[in-house]
């Protein structure tokens, strides 16, 4: 069983987040009562991971954990075996006491594209929607955020996050909750909200943008990253079935169309700050994620297209302000 008591205590002392306590404990109790086939096995492995007290942690330039006194070889082998229990590792990379977790995604590349364009995170409370295993949450703390809260309904992502947090020495500035954005009340409590790699999974993208806006304080900043297509403000791709072998994908606007959508739901100062074609260097199969990945999803005869014939993945970052 997971104990979220530390987070409850934390938000009880935050006047902006206090109202969340009206619904959150019951939501997480319901989640605890819903079974997941592998969760018990993952939890046993998590409990065997040693509680860290590392004296060298770098979350500014990477996510790296180490000690002046290195682990013995046997301890390292045991730790690596436990971490591999949580396969597949999709978001990262992490370096833990010399163990390099080479994840499917180079999430650090995305962070490097996003960071120059956003307001400084120092002393901000941050919400990361669809946070995966929390890689970017650690990088947000590295930029001085006061608190990072991530939401993602995946059981495995929560386990991976808690494993890294345990090795970090139980850092209580970051918390991952196994929830979807639709389960959050209108909090209007966060200084910055990130939604990266989520919008195209939403059946109603405008509703998603409103949900994000509802979590921001007045004057707060939205950082939105999603798959887009080339085109003008009227261009939108709606795949008929899969896109790059992904199910549950719905709307791929152009960056210009997405800017219009953000303005339509009430954001101001909307900026397109980055547009980038995803390469097979950024998303690929690794020793820590051995399933198919981007190279398998592109047309082998024309890598500018997916196997379904759609334009290959292109991602845009937009930044906007809530009035």
Curated annotation (Swiss-Prot):
A GO BP entry: tRNA wobble uridine modification
Record's catalysed reaction(s): carboxy-S-adenosyl-L-methionine + 5-hydroxyuridine(34) in tRNA = 5-carboxymethoxyuridine(34) in tRNA + S-adenosyl-L-homocysteine + H(+)
InterPro entries recorded: CmoB, Mo5U34_MeTrfas-like, SAM-dependent_MTases_sf
Assigned EC number: 2.5.1.-
Binding-site residues, carboxy-S-adenosyl-L-methionine: 91, 105, 110, 130, 152-154, 181-182, 196, 200, 315
Keyword tags: Transferase, tRNA processing
Any one Gene Ontology molecular-function term assigned to this protein's record: methyltransferase activity
Pfam families from the UniProt entry: Methyltransf_9 (PF08003)
Origin superkingdom: Bacteria
Xref: Gene3D superfamilies: Vaccinia Virus protein VP39 (3.40.50.150)
Enzyme class, spelled out: transferase
The keyword Protease is annotated on this UniProt entry: no
HAMAP family in UniProt: tRNA_carboxymethyltr_CmoB (MF_01590)
PANTHER family: METHYLTRANSFERASE, TRNA U34 CARBOXYMETHYLTRANSFERASE
Family statement: Belongs to the class I-like SAM-binding methyltransferase superfamily. CmoB family.
NCBIfam families: PRK15068.1 (NF011650), tRNA 5-methoxyuridine(34)/uridine 5-oxyacetic acid(34) synthase CmoB (TIGR00452)
Function: Catalyzes carboxymethyl transfer from carboxy-S-adenosyl-L-methionine (Cx-SAM) to 5-hydroxyuridine (ho5U) to form 5-carboxymethoxyuridine (cmo5U) at position 34 in tRNAs.
Subunit relationships: Homotetramer.
Record-given protein name: tRNA U34 carboxymethyltransferase
Species: Vibrio campbellii (strain ATCC BAA-1116)
Gene symbol of the encoding locus: cmoB
